[in-house]
Amino acid sequence: MAKSQLVSALFVFFFSLSPIYGDFDYMQLVLTWPRSFCYPRGFCNRIPPNNFTIHGLWPDKKPMRGQLQFCTSDDYIKFTPGSVLDALDHHWIQLKFEREIGIRDQPLWKDQYKKHGTCCLPRYNQLQYFLLAMRLKEKFDLLTTLRTHGITPGTKHTFKKIQDAIKTVTQEVPDLKCVENIQGVLELYEIGICFTPEADSLFPCRQSKSCHPTENPLILFRL
C-alpha cells in the first residue's frame, strides 16, 4: 500500500510539470504472468511473484499504421537508489537477473525505455514514463479479477472466457498473449491493456494471434 501511495504522489507531482504531446494513438500496458515467463526452471534469477508484473508500456499507432520502436536516440539514465528505484523493483521486476545485477545495470528498464519509452517523448519524459506505467498497473488487480471468474493458477480456460473476465474491469478488449510450452500446451503469458495517450480512458487493443483467438482454444494459467 505504501509503495502504491508513493507512486501516485510522485505521478501527480511530476506530471504537473510538463504535459506536452507525443506522436502516438494509444499505448498498451503489457503485464507478464511470471510463472509462465520463468518456465522452464532456471530461466529466472528472481523468485517469480504470484502476481502480474510489468513488461512494458508500449505506445503505438492505430492498426495498419505501423509499430513504434526506437523513436529517438535519447539515452536511458539509470535510476539511483531511492523511492522510484524501490517501486520499480516491486512493480517491474527484472526476473531474468539477480536483484543486485538488475539494480546495478537496469537492463530490462533500459531496454524498454530505449525501445518503447522514447516513442512517448516529448509527452512523457523518462521518469514520467516509468511512473505512468506503475500507476496504470495499480488501476487493475487482474489476478483477483481472474479468480473472481473461476480462472485460477493451474487451470485451463477458453480464450473467450479469459478475455471476457478481463473486460469486466477494462470495458475494452484486452490483448492476450500466449506461449506454447514443451508439451504443446498454450499458456497465458501476458495481458495487454490499452489506454489513450492521455491515459485518462481505456482503448481497444489491437489483437495478437499467439493465443489463436479464432479457434478459442483452452489456455493454461500456469501454477
From Swiss-Prot:
Disulfide pattern: C38-C44, C71-C119, C178-C211, C194-C205
Keyword Disulfide bond (UniProt): yes
Family annotation (PROSITE patterns): RNASE_T2_1 (PS00530), RNASE_T2_2 (PS00531)
GO molecular function: ribonuclease T2 activity; RNA binding; RNA endonuclease activity
Binding site for RNA: H55, Q94, L95, K115, H116
Keywords carried by this UniProt record: Disulfide bond, Endonuclease, Glycoprotein, Hydrolase, Lyase, Nuclease, Secreted, Signal
Physiological role: Self-incompatibility (SI) is the inherited ability of a flowering plant to prevent self-fertilization by discriminating between self and non-self pollen during pollination. In many species of the Solanaceae, self-incompatibility is controlled by the single, multiallelic locus S. This stylar glycoprotein is associated with expression of self-incompatibility in potato.
CDD domains named among the record's database cross-references: RNase_T2_euk (cd01061)
InterPro entries in the cross-refs: Ribonuclease_T2_eukaryotic (IPR033697), RNase_T2-like (IPR001568), RNase_T2-like_sf (IPR036430), RNase_T2_His_AS_1 (IPR018188), RNase_T2_His_AS_2 (IPR033130)
Tissue: Pistil.
Class of the enzyme per the UniProt entry, highest EC level: lyase
Any single GO CC term annotated in Swiss-Prot or TrEMBL for this entry: extracellular region
Family: Belongs to the RNase T2 family.
Catalytic activities: a ribonucleotidyl-ribonucleotide-RNA + H2O = a 3'-end 3'-phospho-ribonucleotide-RNA + a 5'-end dephospho-ribonucleoside-RNA + H(+)
Signal peptide: 1-22
Entries under SUPFAM superfamilies matching the protein: Ribonuclease Rh-like
Organism: Solanum tuberosum (Potato)
Protein name from the UniProt record: Ribonuclease S-2
Active site: H55, Q112, H116
Subcellular location: Secreted, Extracellular space
Keyword Nuclease: yes
Chain positions carrying an annotated carbohydrate: N51
GO BP terms in the entry: RNA catabolic process
Enzyme Commission number(s): 4.6.1.19
